[in-house]
């Protein structure tokens, strides 16, 4: 069990690291205007989770969820520029990962229909958020890197 936890920790550290392939800007470089991005790793195959549908919602004052954007992860398991600084205001957000469809395309029958990550954003001033998710058909783990916006160099 301890080795599995160590694996999860190492996988999450790898997924949120600033390392990027040549020609690919990591968060904070060319994407300095990117207030919200996601990184997803397929822990079964040990590769980025490409072509995973992601929907982003903001909670309204009445408590309902309003979809604000959506996208699909790249071959690197990432989505940059999900929203803008102006649109990403203080509030409660939900990122919904369409995991059943993702695993179904691989011939697997997962437990979760969707995986949701719900969080409060910008309550202590404007920040940039990188949400990292590690997926298997029966479990998930998430972490966040919250940072100050970077000035253009």
Curated annotation (Swiss-Prot):
SMART domains: TR_THY. Coiled coil: none annotated. L-thyroxine binds at residues 39, 78, 141. Residues 1-19 form the signal peptide. It is found in: Secreted. Detected in plasma (at protein level). Expressed during metamorphosis in tadpole liver, but not in tadpole brain nor adult liver. Between 1.5 and 3 days of development, also expressed in the mesoderm of the kidney. One of its GO terms (molecular function) is identical protein binding. The keyword Transmembrane does not apply. GO terms for biological process: purine nucleobase metabolic process; response to estrogen; thyroid hormone transport. The keyword Glycoprotein applies. Glycans are attached at residue 81. Homotetramer. Dimer of dimers. In the homotetramer, subunits assemble around a central channel that can accommodate two ligand molecules. Interacts with rbp4. Belongs to the transthyretin family. The N-terminus strongly influences thyroid hormone-binding properties. Thyroid hormone-binding protein, with a much higher binding affinity for triiodothyronine (T3) than for thyroxine (T4). Probably transports triiodothyronine from the bloodstream to the brain. This is Transthyretin. The gene is ttr.
């Amino acid at each position: 069990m301890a080795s599995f936890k160590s694996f999860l920790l190492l996988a999450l550290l790898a997924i949120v690291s600033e390392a990027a392939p040549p020609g690919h800007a990591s968060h904070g470089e060319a994407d300095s205007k990117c207030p919200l991005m996601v990184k997803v790793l397929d822990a079964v195959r040990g590769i980025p989770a490409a072509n995973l549908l992601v929907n982003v919602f903001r909670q309204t004052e009445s408590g309902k969820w309003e979809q604000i954007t959506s996208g699909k992860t790249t071959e690197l398991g990432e989505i940059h520029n999900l929203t803008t600084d102006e649109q990403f205001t203080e509030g409660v957000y939900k990122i919904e990962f369409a995991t059943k469809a993702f695993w179904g395309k691989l011939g697997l029958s997962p437990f979760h229909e969707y995986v949701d990550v719900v969080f409060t954003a910008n309550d202590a001033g404007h920040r940039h958020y990188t949400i990292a998710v590690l997926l298997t058909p029966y479990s998930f783990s998430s972490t966040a890197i919250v940072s100050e916006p970077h000035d253009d160099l």
